[in-house]
Amino acid sequence: DYLNKIFLGKPKRVLVERAETGENFKKSYNAALARLRNKSWNWLTFPGLEPHKDLTEELQNWIIAQRAAKKTFKAVLPCSAANNEGIVNFSSSGIKVGAKTYSAYEYCARIAGLLAGLSMTESATYQVLSEIDSITESLTPNEDIDEGKFILINDGEKVKVARGVNSLHILSGDKTEDMKKIKIIEGMDLMRDDIRSAFENNYIGINNSYDNKVMFVAAINQYFDGLVREGVLYGDAENTADILWIQFCES
């Protein structure tokens, strides 16, 4: 059922890691995370988390640590007030689909599949989940969104995503208002992965000359131009890379 829910969102690829039940659960869970650390993926969900609610904070901290290490991992977790752009705090419950009612824990898989399947020009905001008959509706949806909660709403005809936000809601340091939006973080992560991949595959190991630096910067700017044409970057913004020179002078 969880995999079927994920595929409703039409993700390009799905990785499945298995964890044992019973006394070996924690060991196999840690082994699964270790395997995932060195794989390429974007969105994580853990459909069987509800019996192990104590792991929610541990899992969110793992994602945050991986992002600090320049990974672009993100996760959909239930009722997780992480205040981090890499965590989507799914907070709707009482989700009725046919004869079955799902909790937030159980429906995170559907949300992860939805987010993974969106193109870079699409937002999660107002995306319709047509299979849902009803939900336990929030009495304070605007306040929930402001607190970094990803919730579903019923407009009287259909159930849909209220707004495509992650759990970031208290800004500090280099965190900006735009970074509360899942779509913005997806674009930032895409550029980080693509530029790093281009550098590692085409420029590491060659002479670090000025001409080669100029070639790399030109390739990045050409890449930015492509993102503008595709609608990922705003065309009226200054989407350019350059070489920064710092000269130290002795007094």
What spans do the regions from the language model cover?
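Surface-exposed assembly/interface segments
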Residues: 1-251
